[in-house]
């Protein structure tokens, strides 16, 4: 069981941040190696592990967003003015962009949970659907990355409409194989973000949803999960360490190349899943 928790933690740490779908890989690994398919509590634990990896890697940004946004709100309430420092304005704006980007996916998620039958989500978790999603959204990423070359690399160049569009795009990630980071990076590239800004904004935008979602899964308490609290903790620690390494590596890689390798991988892996689904 320890080995299973470690393997699933490694897969989560690697695939959560790469635009290749963590859900599909966790599911396939469990099937191929005949592991127990992880339940809500374990998945929430490893999700929090990767969330804390992001918080640590972007600690300066997270700290700046929280402190300067709070200070600006307090200043506005007290004096009706904004802070003038350039860095403070950047963090304040980034905080507001993340809020506006989070609101649509929360609202859409609530509507889905409220009105879409539970059977839809379980029915979508099959090899064929995952394979098609990997291929289609992989090609979209490649198209956006190749076609839209205009550089938008500054926080001040991001509009609130763009943050809403990128945030709303996260809802597609409920389809196994889409990839939350993949769809947000793709949308950002369609909006002419350069690769570094697209990845940075995508990762920061994921924090509110993944952190709150992970905490909710833990607060809801252990389900009938095969993995106990101890094994869930092991998975979370492993996903944290691996996730931290992957974030650092990805940001270095995209500063020198395109997303083409991820596109090739998604298409080939997707084709494999589609073919296997017929046997």
Curated annotation (Swiss-Prot):
Coiled coil: none annotated. The chain crosses the membrane at residues 1-21, 39-59, 96-116, 128-148, 155-175, 201-221, 231-251, 259-279. Keywords: Antibiotic resistance, Cell membrane, Cell shape, Cell wall biogenesis/degradation, Hydrolase, Membrane, Peptidoglycan synthesis, Transmembrane, Transmembrane helix. One of its GO terms (molecular function) is undecaprenyl-diphosphatase activity. It catalyses: di-trans,octa-cis-undecaprenyl diphosphate + H2O = di-trans,octa-cis-undecaprenyl phosphate + phosphate + H(+). Its EC number is 3.6.1.27. InterPro entries: UppP. GO terms for cellular component: plasma membrane. One of its GO terms (biological process) is regulation of cell shape. It is a multi-pass membrane protein. It is found in: Cell membrane. Pfam families: BacA (PF02673). The keyword Methyltransferase does not apply. Belongs to the UppP family. Catalyzes the dephosphorylation of undecaprenyl diphosphate (UPP). Confers resistance to bacitracin. Bacitracin is thought to be involved in the inhibition of peptidoglycan synthesis by sequestering undecaprenyl diphosphate, thereby reducing the pool of lipid carrier available. PANTHER family: UNDECAPRENYL-DIPHOSPHATASE. This is Undecaprenyl-diphosphatase. The gene is uppP.
């Amino acid at each position: 069981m320890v080995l299973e928790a470690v393997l699933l933690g490694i897969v989560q740490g690697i695939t959560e941040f790469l635009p290749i779908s963590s859900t599909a890989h966790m599911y396939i690994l469990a099937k191929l190696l005949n592991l127990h398919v992880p339940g809500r509590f374990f998945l929430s634990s490893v999700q929090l592990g990767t969330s804390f990896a992001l918080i640590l890697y972007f600690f300066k940004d997270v700290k700046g967003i929280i402190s300067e946004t709070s200070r600006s709100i307090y200043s506005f309430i007290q004096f009706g003015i904004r802070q003038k420092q350039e860095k403070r304005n950047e963090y304040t704006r980034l905080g507001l962009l993340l809020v506006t980007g989070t609101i649509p996916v929360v609202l859409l998620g609530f509507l889905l949970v409220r009105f879409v039958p539970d059977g839809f989500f379980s029915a979508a978790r099959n090899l064929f659907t995952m394979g098609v999603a990997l291929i289609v959204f992989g090609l979209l990423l490649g198209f956006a990355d190749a076609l839209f070359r205009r550089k938008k690399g500054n926080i001040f160049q991001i509009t609130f409409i763009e943050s809403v569009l990128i945030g709303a795009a996260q809802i597609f990630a409920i389809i196994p194989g889409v990839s939350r980071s993949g769809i947000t990076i793709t949308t950002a590239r369609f909006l002419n973000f350069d690769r570094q800004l697209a990845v940075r904004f995508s990762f920061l935008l994921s924090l509110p949803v993944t952190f709150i979602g992970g905490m909710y899964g833990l607060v809801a308490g252990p389900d009938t999960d095969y993995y106990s609290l101890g094994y869930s903790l092991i998975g979370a620690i492993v996903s944290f360490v691996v996730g931290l390494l992957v974030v650092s590596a990805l940001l270095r890689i995209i500063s020198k190349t395109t997303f083409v390798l991820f596109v090739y991988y998604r298409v080939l892996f997707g084709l494999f899943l589609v073919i296997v689904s017929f046997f």
